[in-house]
């Protein structure tokens, strides 16, 4: 983990343009604000190109996708590519329906993502690996290393596969991350917020490898820190403490361990 990346985010407060799902907007916005970034949730086709052009990163998340939003996502992504602005693509539930899969195919035909992030089931679907999924959730793991590498090679992008052990594949390197807590898997939008944190880190002056590892490991560390506080007894009490923990520095999260 590179502490300087987190410091850069808090110094620059990067604007992250979210084209994300309705379920997680509030959680993603507050989590990113706590971390140090600045969220904007603009999806209207009339303004997405202008918003994307002034943003420091663009996040595309298809969790509650509509046909109108698909048009906006492609427009924002293409604008970001034109201006060399990093793009994170989160293909939420892509394995669930043909509508979602066709939408992701259209996005990837026109937009070059810097990073594709998803769970094992979602990313396995992108490379036609048969892995069981339930709605937007993965209920199998498969070989995450193989899935990450195949997605990276197919789309020429860095990849983050989330799970009990996260897998990052970037520049022909595999990285494994074991930080985190099982409460995250019981909270709607925890993976979506991770996308926001990654997007913020993509705006810093560092290598893509360090940006991804820092974002993923810090996020998991924040979760384990929050879960271990005396006033946390379940997911309901965990949530506000987790949001608070995202504003801390890594050394604060490991004190006393």
UniProtKB/Swiss-Prot annotation:
Query: What Gene3D superfamilies does the entry give?
Result: 3.40.1190.20
Biological process terms from the Gene Ontology for this record are:
thiamine biosynthetic process; thiamine diphosphate biosynthetic process
The UniProt entry's GO CC annotations, sorted and at most eight, read: cytosol
Residues binding ATP are 117, 162
Q: List the catalysed reactions.
A: 5-(2-hydroxyethyl)-4-methylthiazole + ATP = 4-methyl-5-(2-phosphooxyethyl)-thiazole + ADP + H(+)
One MF term in the entry's GO annotations? magnesium ion binding
Key words of the record: ATP-binding, Kinase, Magnesium, Metal-binding, Nucleotide-binding, Thiamine biosynthesis, Transferase
Look at the named UniProt entry and state the broad enzyme category this protein falls under. transferase
- Disulfide bond residue pairs: none
The organism's superkingdom is given as: Bacteria
Member of which family?
Answer: Belongs to the Thz kinase family.
What's its job? Catalyzes the phosphorylation of the hydroxyl group of 4-methyl-5-beta-hydroxyethylthiazole (THZ).
- The protein here is known as Hydroxyethylthiazole kinase 1
Organism equals: Oceanobacillus iheyensis (strain DSM 14371 / CIP 107618 / JCM 11309 / KCTC 3954 / HTE831)
């Amino acid at each position: 983990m590179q502490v300087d990346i987190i410091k850069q985010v808090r110094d620059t407060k990067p604007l992250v343009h979210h084209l994300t799902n309705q379920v997680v907007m509030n959680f993603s916005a507050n989590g990113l604000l706590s971390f140090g970034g600045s969220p904007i949730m603009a999806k209207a086709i009339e303004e997405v190109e202008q918003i994307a052009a002034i943003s420091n990163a663009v996040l595309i998340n298809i969790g509650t996708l509509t046909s109108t939003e698909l048009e906006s996502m492609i427009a924002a992504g293409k604008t970001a590519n034109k201006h060399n602005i990093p793009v994170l693509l989160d293909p939420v539930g892509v394995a669930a329906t043909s509508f979602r899969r066709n939408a992701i195919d259209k996005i990837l035909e026109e937009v070059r993502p810097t990073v594709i992030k998803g769970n094992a089931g979602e990313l396995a679907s992108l490379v036609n690996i048969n892995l069981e999924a339930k709605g937007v959730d993965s209920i199998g793991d498969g070989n995450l290393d193989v899935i990450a590498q195949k997605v990276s090679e197919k789309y020429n992008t860095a990849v983050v596969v989330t799970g009990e052990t996260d897998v990052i594949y970037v520049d022909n390197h595999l990285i494994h991350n074991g930080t985190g807590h099982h409460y995250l898997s019981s909270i709607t939008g925890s993976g979506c917020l991770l996308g926001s944190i990654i997007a913020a880190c993509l705006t810093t002056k560092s290598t893509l490898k360090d940006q991804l590892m820092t974002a993923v490991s810090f996020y998991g560390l924040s979760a384990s820190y929050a879960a271990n506080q005396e006033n946390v007894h379940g997911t309901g009490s965990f949530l506000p403490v987790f949001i608070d923990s995202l504003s801390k520095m890594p050394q604060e999260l490991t004190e006393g361990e």
